[in-house]
């Protein structure tokens, strides 16, 4: 696995150390994920991962599974097991800005998620569509192409892209099931959007 820079490696090492001291029974109950034979089983974007405890290791029956080679994604999963909680029932979707602390983080979020999605996928709508379909996402009738993903447990995300033209640049929108606002901190919602885009991009 390649580590791109210290900004990825240092946070991962911090949470890996905290993970070793985790109470696995408490984490399993709080997050709603199974723990057996020294391993948590977590499903992210339709792929099952086994996370070994207390000496961290991640594995999957899918050799090309995205998180196996993406350190920020692994850090996100560690944070979920350390601080997250099982999804509450969801009644709908919200934009990032509509959720708590969304206004404060909207600048980084726009750059890391919306602008990146717009220029990564808005210029390649058909490839975006094919990648989402290959990932098992559900097509929705919004945007030039739009899909709904089961992100993690009962947390869902929708992503819509709009192709640019001579007058307007490409654009995008990402919606979160409203249980994200109680299940994740604002910075983790930014990372969730980043992970979704990176995972789709890996399938282009």
What are the residue ranges of the model-derived segments?
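Short Lys/Arg-enriched alpha/beta "domain-start" segment
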Residues: 1-38, 73, 80-135
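Charge-rich alpha-helical segments
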Residues: 1-18, 28, 37, 55-57, ...
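Amphipathic, interaction-prone secondary-structure segments
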Residues: 27-53, 138-163
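Intrinsically disordered, low-complexity regulatory segments enriched in Ser/Thr/Pro
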Residues: 47-75, 162-187
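Short, charged/polar micro-motifs that form catalytic or ligand-binding hotspots
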Residues: 63, 67, 118, 145, ...
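Ampiphathic alpha-helical segments that act as solvent-exposed interaction surfaces
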Residues: 66-90, 177-204
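Conserved binding-pocket/active-site segment within a compact domain
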Residues: 122-182
